[in-house]
Design a protein with these regions (language model features):
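N-terminal secretory signal peptides and thylakoid transit peptides that target proteins
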Residues: 1-17
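Active-site acidic/histidine proton-transfer and metal-coordination neighborhood
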Residues: 12-25, 29-42, 71, 106-229, ...
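Boundary/entry segment of secreted carbohydrate-active catalytic domains
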Residues: 41-65
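Hydrophobic faces of well-ordered beta-strands that scaffold small-molecule active sites
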Residues: 46-52, 80-84, 120-125, 161-163, ...
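Short, acidic/polar
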Residues: 60-75, 140-151, 266-274, 302
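Acidic/histidine-rich catalytic cores of soluble enzymes
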Residues: 63, 81-82, 175, 181-307
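Catalytic domains of carbohydrate-active enzymes, especially glycoside hydrolases
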Residues: 67-87, 157
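Glycine-rich, proline-tolerant flexible connector loops at the mouths of alpha/beta enzymes
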Residues: 83-108, 168-171
């Protein structure tokens, strides 16, 4: 990693740490999210929602239809809030990427939600272009490509649209931050006119560096632009089996002490990252992969994570996102729910 990259990331870490301890970021997390409980009762401080991605295998294999997701979630898991994923109700556009299906389809989605007394929390939005694209024309297309998803989120009564802060990874961190900040600000300004939040998940690349992402959100400077901390998404680079590609991608972060390498890739500390992102959080994603005999997640200490969430003053939905491959999706979701319920009672 070159000196400029190290200096920028070091400044970001120092700024985030100073602001967090000084209380600069507390307002976002201490406010109840739209639709969330504002009671002081610790028993209802957190509510469980289900991220649709937890069921992605069944959806992609045709075993579950997108329209049946609300009913299935309620009847199978006794969960009453859902987080949609745009990959399951899109049409492809030549320049704008994934776009929502037509209004009649969205109306049927909304009807299914209402028929079963469910709550739509947010839409997770992917493959709509990079909001930090260095090409100004493509960056504008990415911003405008998200507009229809804002309309869909508003129609479905969601409070937020989850997006990605992605740029050209070969650029230095400061340039990537500036580009992502511009795209996020433009999209958030549009969302504000609709009463919606734009929230960024740590989702690979520099967005999985908690200090970098927190600094980018701070630079946007709008109250409706926040984060969706994901307990398990702190790999800046994943090892997907292609040795040459992995070494090339990993070289961009060489010499940076914030990252540790394991068999899955190059990772930022998940607890530090969550702590850095929580002051801006308008949602929380409880990522789970594997469990031990006692029902604990083997990669993430859920008690430690939920203590961080609680200490940030957060109230609202905590979304189950089961992504393991050792258990079936139903069992994995059930185990994650049981773990969260146990941990909620502890913290």
């Amino acid at each position: 990693m070159n000196l400029d990259r190290r200096r920028f990331l070091a400044r970001s870490s120092a700024t985030v740490a100073a602001a967090a301890t000084g209380g600069l970021f507390t307002a976002c997390s201490e406010k109840a999210e739209p639709g969330a409980t504002s009671t002081e009762d610790e028993g209802t401080r957190f509510e469980i929602s289900l991220a649709q991605w937890s069921l992605h295998r069944g959806l992609k294999e045709g075993k579950l239809d997108n329209l049946d997701y609300p009913k299935y979630t309620k009847e199978t898991f006794d969960i009453h809030a859902i987080e949609w994923v745009n990959q399951f109700f899109f049409v492809e556009h030549a320049t704008l990427g994934y776009q929502p299906k037509d209004q009649a389809y969205l109306a049927e989605m909304k009807k299914r939600v209402e028929d079963h007394g469910m709550t739509s929390v947010l839409i997770m939005c992917d493959r709509v272009g990079n909001l930090g694209n260095p090409d100004a024309v493509k960056r504008t297309a990415a911003v405008e490509g998200h507009y229809a998803w804002l309309e869909a989120a508003k129609f479905l009564d969601c409070h937020s649209l989850r997006v990605n802060a992605a740029s050209d990874p070969t650029l230095n961190p400061e340039m990537q931050s500036d580009l992502c900040t511009e795209g996020l600000r433009r999209l958030s300004e549009k969302a504000a006119t609709m009463g919606l939040n734009v929230i960024v998940e740590n989702h690979g690349g520099l967005s999985s560096n908690g200090a970098w992402l927190a600094q980018a959100i701070k630079n946007v400077g709008l109250p409706n632009c926040g984060t969706l901390p994901d307990f398990g998404n702190f790999y800046v680079v994943k090892n997907r089996g292609d040795v040459a590609q992995y070494e090339k991608d990993k070289a961009l972060y060489a010499g940076e002490p914030a990252y540790k390498e394991d068999e899955k890739g190059l990772a930022y500390d998940r607890y530090l990252g969550t702590k850095e992102l929580m002051p801006y959080a308008k949602g929380v994603s409880a990522k789970a992969h594997d469990f031990d005999a006692r029902g604990n997640e083997t990669h993430t200490d859920f008690v430690k994570m939920m203590e961080i969430v609680k200490e940030a003053g957060y109230r609202g939905h905590v979304g189950i996102e089961y992504e393991g491959d050792q258990l079936g999706e139903v069992e994995g979701i059930q185990k994650t729910k049981a773990l969260l319920e146990r941990v909620f009672a502890m913290v």
